[in-house]
Every structure is written in C-alpha cells, then in structure tokens.
Amino acid sequence: MSLDNELPNRPRSWKVLLHHVFQIPKAFLDNEEKSQEYTYELMTESPPEKLKNSSDIANFGEEISNRFIIWWKKSRDSDFSKQVPTYFGMTSRHELLERTVWHSTQHIRQLQSLLENLEIKPGEIISNEQMKGLPLTQEIWDEQKM
C-alpha cells in the first residue's frame, strides 16, 4: 500500500491524513510560540515534499510531540482564559487546546479503524477511557460506516 493511496470514501490520501494528525497541534503550537494566527490554511497545510514515507511522518510527529512537551512545561501555569484569534472567531487558549486534542484524536480514531480493516494492529491504541470527556461523536466517520 502506498501512502499516496486515497482513503476509502474520502478525497484524502493516507499521507495527508497522517500528516494532518500532527499538523493540527503544529498549528496550535505555532499560534502559541510564534503568535501566528490559527488559520484554517495553517491547520490543513499539505504535507511538505520532504515527508515521503511513514518514517518521515513519524519523525515529524515526534518533533511536534517534543515541541508540545516543552511548550506545556513552560505554559501549564499561564492564563488559558486569554482570547486568541482563529479562523472560527475569538476563542480562549483553553478552548483552542481542547479543540486541538479532540480534532487530532478523532483522526487517530479513523486511522485505527482503517488499520483494523486492513487487519493491522497498532502498537498503541487510544482507549475509550483516554477519550472520556472529549466532545467526540460515537461514530468514527461522518457519513456511512466503513
């Protein structure tokens, strides 16, 4: 299977979805660290040319994860009620962080489902307990079940 293959019933490739899982928190971090406005275009940015295979995407994800850990250590005691501009209007830093978490989580659920359909067991899965409290739908996909 190629990462350029389209997902079932989606106009999106595996590569785009895998990248998007990490691009969402990257957009959040760019907003936090660089005061870059949280735009739809930033959040949905296409994978750069240098991301050619799953290892490249995993490395990108590791980079974002490390950035997040460092950011959180510096920011956890800061004012999360502060308002920030986004493509969907002004919102609190807390709301944007929560939205970042559930948005990426929803796509991870989709990836887990796709892998399950291919009879591939991920090394780690997100459990229902870990998702408790996140505003996620019961359904993994918007439309029909895949």
Specify the residue positions occupied by each region the protein language model found:
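Short, contiguous alpha-helical
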Residues: 2-47, 83-146
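Intrinsically disordered, low-complexity segments enriched in polar/charged residues with Gly/Pro
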Residues: 58, 72, 86-88
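A short, structured beta-strand-centered segment in the mid-to-C-terminal lobe
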Residues: 49-64
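Catalytic cores of extracellular degradative/oxidative enzymes
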Residues: 49-52, 70-84
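Amphipathic, heptad-repeat alpha-helices with coiled-coil/zipper character that mediate oligomerization
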Residues: 26, 63-73
